[in-house]
C-alpha cells in the first residue's frame, strides 16, 4: 500500500487546513522513506513470497525496525518533534498521527511480517491481516482511499477558496492530481 497512504493524507488535509499538504504526504510515507536507507544498507530487506512471481502484495517485507510497532511510534514521534517548532503543537500531533497511520494501514494489507518490537526482539508473533492475498480487495481499498481523499480535499479546498474569494480551479486541479497520481501509482504497483 502506497497510494492509499497518500489518499489518507489528502483526507486528513480536508479537515486540518493549517498543515501543508506536502507535509501530510511526507508523513504518510515517512516509514517508507526511513526504510530506504535501512534497505540500502541491508538492515531491512524484501523477499518475494514463496510460490509467487513478485509484484503487488507478493513480497515479504523484513522492515523489522521501521515497520515494527514500537519503531513506528518512535519514528512518528521524531517527525512530530521536527515539525513542532515549525507549525506548532496541533500540527505536529496531526503529522505524527498521519505517520503512525502508515503502520495501521499496512497492518491491513501486509502478510504477518510486521514485528511489534524493533529487530523483532523477544520474537513475538509478527502482525499483518494479509489482504494482499486478495489483490482485488486490497486494490479496491486503496482506490477508495485515494478517491475519497481527493474528493474530500477538493470539497474542503474549494470551500476555502470561495471563502477567500479565490478561484476554486486550483483546488480542483490539485484534487485531480491526487486522484490521478494515486490511481497511477496503484496501477503501476498492481501491474508489476
Question: In which residue ranges do the predicted regions lie?
Answer:
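N-terminal membrane-targeting hydrophobic helices
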Residues: 1-192
Amino acid at each position: 500500500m502506497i497510494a492509499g497512504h497518500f489518499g489518507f493524507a489528502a483526507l486528513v488535509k480536508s479537515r486540518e487546513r493549517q498543515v501543508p499538504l506536502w507535509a501530510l504526504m511526507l508523513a504518510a510515507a515517512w516509514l517508507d522513506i526511513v526504510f530506504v536507507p535501512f534497505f540500502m544498507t541491508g538492515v531491512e530487506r524484501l523477499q518475494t513470497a514463496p510460490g509467487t512471481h513478485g509484484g503487488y502484495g507478493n513480497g515479504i517485507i523484513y522492515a523489522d525496525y521501521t515497520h515494527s510497532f514500537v519503531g513506528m511510534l518512535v519514528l512518528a514521534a521524531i517527525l512530530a518533534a521536527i515539525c513542532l517548532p515549525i507549525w506548532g503543537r496541533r500540527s505536529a500531533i496531526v503529522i505524527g498521527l498521519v505517520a503512525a497511520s502508515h503502520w495501521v494501514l499496512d497492518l491491513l494489507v501486509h502478510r504477518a511480517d510486521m514485528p511489534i518490537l524493533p529487530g523483532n526482539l523477544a520474537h513475538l508473533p509478527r502482525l499483518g491481516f494479509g489482504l494482499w492475498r486478495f489483490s482485488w480487495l486490497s486494490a479496491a481499498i486503496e482506490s477508495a482511499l485515494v478517491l475519497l481523499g481527493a474528493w474530500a480535499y477538493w470539497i474542503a479546498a474549494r470551500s476555502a477558496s470561495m471563502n477567500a474569494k479565490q478561484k476554486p480551479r486550483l483546488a480542483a486541479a490539485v484534487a485531480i492530481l491526487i486522484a490521478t497520481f494515486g490511481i497511477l501509482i496503484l496501477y503501476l504497483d498492481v501491474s508489476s
